[in-house]
Amino acid sequence: MRKTGIFAAGLSGLLAFAATAAVAQPGARPVRYGLNGPELDGCTPYSEIRGLNPRGDNFVSVRAAPTTAGRELDRLGPGRKVWICEEVGGWAGIVYGPRASTGCNVESPIPRVRAYRGPCRSGWVSSRYVTPIAG
């Protein structure tokens, strides 16, 4: 009977660890585009990173999922241009090029909603740091 108790305690500890790890490191959630329908651009509006604290980090983290626990993919500074493709609970799913470029293939209508796979980068940032500037 003692072995069963040890096994049960070990198993419950392992399950608790796995649950904690799952909460601490959520899986990636691809940014989707085409949510505006087949007649409108894949992502709107064209936006800019603003409102960062110049005395602080002065960047916004781009994350793999719409949560602060999501893996950091990149850091964007003030003035960086991005496309907002999706919004989820205070997070903006964005697409952005290497510079203030277009050519990310989100500026035209697409026939159906799909996960963004390139050619530019994508991820999630806090919506409070993204300000629409066009579209």
Language-model segment annotations:
Residues 1-4:
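Positively charged n-region of N-terminal signal peptides that target proteins for export
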Residues 8-18:
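Bacterial N-terminal signal peptides
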Residues 20-24:
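Sec/Tat signal peptide C-region and signal peptidase I cleavage site
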Residues 25-46, 96-135:
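Boundary regions of SH3-family modules and the immediately adjacent low-complexity/disordered segments
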Residues 49-62:
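Short, basic/aromatic beta-hairpin or loop at an interaction surface
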Residues 64-78, 86:
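SH3/SH3-like (including bacterial SH3b) beta-barrel domains
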Residues 79, 92-96:
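SH3/SH3-like beta-barrel fold
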